[in-house]
Amino acid sequence: MNFSRIFFFVFALVLALSTVSAAPEPKWKVFKKIEKMGRNIRNGIVKAGPAIAVLGEAKALG
């Protein structure tokens, strides 16, 4: 019976420590900056698409 109590206590302790260490760390900010940069590039390409299409049509005309 003592073994089961000790086992339960150790299991609860490990579970508590694993949930605390799962908190996000500051190093994730680097990936967020990379993601934001990629988003800005994608949005710039989407916005420039119609202008590039107009230039292509103008070049084809003459």
From Swiss-Prot:
GO terms for cellular component: extracellular region. PROSITE patterns: CECROPIN (PS00268). Coiled coil: none annotated. Keywords: Amidation, Antibiotic, Antimicrobial, Immunity, Innate immunity, Secreted, Signal. Residues 1-22 form the signal peptide. The modification Leucine amide is found at residue 61. The keyword Signal applies. GO terms for biological process: antibacterial humoral response; defense response to Gram-positive bacterium; innate immune response. Residues 23-26 form a propeptide. It comes from the Eukaryota. InterPro entries: Cecropin. It is found in: Secreted. Cecropins have lytic and antibacterial activity against several Gram-positive and Gram-negative bacteria. Belongs to the cecropin family. This is Cecropin-B.
